């Protein structure tokens, strides 16, 4: 994959944002945490787009969302000093997650924040590739594209992996697992940190 063909999704308008959200819905359809939050397929398809929009709003606004030129992969970054929209995220959780899981889901998000660096850093909030196009280097290309920005600025990076199958990809790009989080019936979640380069 030619990483020079990536561009910021936010600068091309609402149609590109909608396409990015749809790509993420397809990409996370088998993700352990996403499917723990929305177990039933119809509920996942109905509610996940709103969740991803809330998680990505600040990234889109900051022009820090990248997609592959074909739109099959998406990475949503938060630059240093740009915060996510916690209020919108909390509202989405309250309105879309079954009541029995809301406290655990909120606790998962809160605990992932505990491991974020206190120094200015880039935060990879979501990265996903459509299922039929995985294992072709798309995710790695998106990751490398974002990490080049981190390296140009000499900034660390943070993410949390919701799927243990993806931790090796992140490790190959310099991330280290710093903890394992599990709340109630949640699957394990792995906060990961990449030092300044």
State the predicted function of each range:
Residues 140, 152-154, 163-180, 184-187:
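Conserved active-site alpha-helix within GNAT-family acetyltransferase domains
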Residues 57-77:
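Conserved beta-hairpin
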């Amino acid at each position: 994959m030619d990483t020079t063909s990536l561009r910021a999704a936010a600068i091309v308008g609402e149609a590109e944002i909608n396409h990015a959200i749809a790509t993420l819905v397809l990409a996370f359809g088998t993700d352990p945490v996403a499917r723990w939050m929305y177990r039933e397929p119809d509920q996942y398809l109905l509610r996940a787009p709103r969740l991803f929009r809330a998680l990505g709003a600040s990234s889109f606004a900051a022009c820090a969302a990248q997609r592959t030129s074909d739109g099959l992969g998406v990475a949503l970054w938060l630059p240093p000093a740009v915060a996510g929209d916690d209020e919108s995220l909390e509202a989405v959780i309250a309105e879309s997650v079954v009541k029995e899981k809301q406290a655990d889901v909120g606790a998962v998000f809160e605990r992932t924040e505990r491991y974020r660096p206190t120094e200015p850093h880039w935060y990879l909030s979501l990265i996903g590739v459509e299922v039929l196009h995985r294992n072709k280097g798309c995710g790695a290309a998106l990751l490398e594209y974002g990490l080049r920005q981190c390296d140009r600025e000499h900034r660390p990076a943070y993410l949390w992996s919701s799927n243990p199958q993806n931790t090796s990809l992140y490790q190959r790009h310099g991330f280290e697992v710093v903890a394992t989080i599990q709340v109630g019936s949640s699957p394990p979640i792995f906060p990961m940190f990449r030092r300044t380069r």
